[in-house]
Amino acid sequence: LVPGKYVKPIADSVTFDKAIFVDVTNQNIATLEHTGSKWLVRSMNPATTGQHRPPYAQETPLGIFVVQEKKARMIYLVDGSKETGGFAPYASRFTNGGYIHGVPVNAPRKSLIEYSPTLGTTPRSHMCVRNATSHAKFVYDWAPVNETIVFIFD
């Protein structure tokens, strides 16, 4: 079992009005919001999830998660080194090392990249859910920490 220090219980009275769905088979992401008695689709976009390429890349884990943290720029390292490889914009963390974020920007480039033609095709990331940068910003702005549920399924 997982040691208690790594588990943050959610009270049984907690409800979620915002949900993110990631389909790793079809490589897409959707956001839904509970309004009144209905769930409304707020967005649907192509995405790229994690690929199996040990020791640095792994599949996006399947399961139910909660948005836990946000970083406007998530810095990442070059595989196997301590050298900065670049950053992923508008990163919303849903599990240890797993983020929903925009198109990665490899160093030394500093400007954002809106789209990648590989979105919606095959798994390519290290574990994260990569999507268009404008959509990642939407998720980043729209999904409150500890109040947004994330479903990763195949």
PLM-predicted stretches and their roles:
Residues V24-T60:
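Glycine-rich catalytic cores of cysteine/serine-nucleophile enzymes that process amide/ester linkages
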Residues L1, M44-P46, I64-V66, I149:
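Well-ordered beta-strand positions in beta-sheet-rich domains
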Residues L1-K18:
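Boundary regions of SH3-family modules and the immediately adjacent low-complexity/disordered segments
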Residues Y6, N26, E33-T35, K71, ...:
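A mature extracytoplasmic/lumenal domain signature
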Residues G4-K8, P46-R53, P104-P108:
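A short, sequence-level motif marking secondary-structure junctions
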Residues I29, V67, S92:
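Conserved hydrophobic/aromatic pocket- or pore-lining residues that grip, position, or stack substrates
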Residues T15-A19, Y56-K70:
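Short, surface-exposed secondary-structure junctions/capping segments
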Residues L62, M74-D154:
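Exported/periplasmic cell-wall-interacting domains
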